[in-house]
From Swiss-Prot:
Disulfide bonds join C3-C22, C17-C39, C41-C52, C53-C58. This is Toxin C10S2C2. Residues 41-48 are annotated as: Important for binding to L-type calcium channels. It comes from the Eukaryota. Pfam families: Toxin_cobra-type. InterPro entries: Snake_3FTx, Snake_toxin-like_sf, Snake_toxin_con_site, Toxin_cobra-type. Its main location: secreted. Keywords: Calcium channel impairing toxin, Cardiotoxin, Disulfide bond, Ion channel impairing toxin, Secreted, Toxin, Voltage-gated calcium channel impairing toxin. Belongs to the three-finger toxin family. Short-chain subfamily. L-type calcium blocker sub-subfamily. Expressed by the venom gland. GO terms for cellular component: extracellular region. Gene3D superfamilies: CD59. The keyword Disulfide bond applies.
């Protein structure tokens, strides 16, 4: 799986993962502000929320 791994406003970067999913993490009240991206599907703590997906570069 190829997932985006860049933080919020940094230039796009990808990484090859062994996990079969990608995620993006954002603040629940500001879903347009992505605070983190990467491989897998981690559990988020309030006020963050995780959106997980299963496809190459799906966590745009």
């Amino acid at each position: 799986r190829i997932c985006y791994s860049h933080k919020a406003s940094l230039p796009r970067a990808t990484k090859t993962c062994v996990e079969n999913s990608c995620y993006k993490m954002f603040i629940r009240t500001s879903p347009d502000y992505i605070s983190d991206r990467g491989c897998g599907c981690p559990t988020a703590m309030w006020p963050y929320q995780t959106a997980c997906c299963k496809g190459d570069r799906c966590n745009k």
